Amino acid sequence: MKTMTCRQLGGPCDLEHHGDTADEMIKTQDRHLKQAARAGDSAHEPAHADMKGRWRHPKRAMGWYRGVKRTFAELPQDAHHAS
């Protein structure tokens, strides 16, 4: 299990997400951005718009995705979840 923040995933806050894969982190971040946008959190609106627009810009989206996967791979395992 590893930890990444909303900010590490392109968002504006330091909410921590936990997961075993980069894909889990991305899904958790997407849910977080949707919830923040629904709640009217204007600080999260740019990141939410980027998330929604990824499918329209596949090359840029793949660059972002590879960056997240690289960052995730470089993170240490969480101490309290290490096996």
Outline where the language-model segments fall.
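Metal-centered catalytic cores of metalloenzymes
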Residues: 1-83
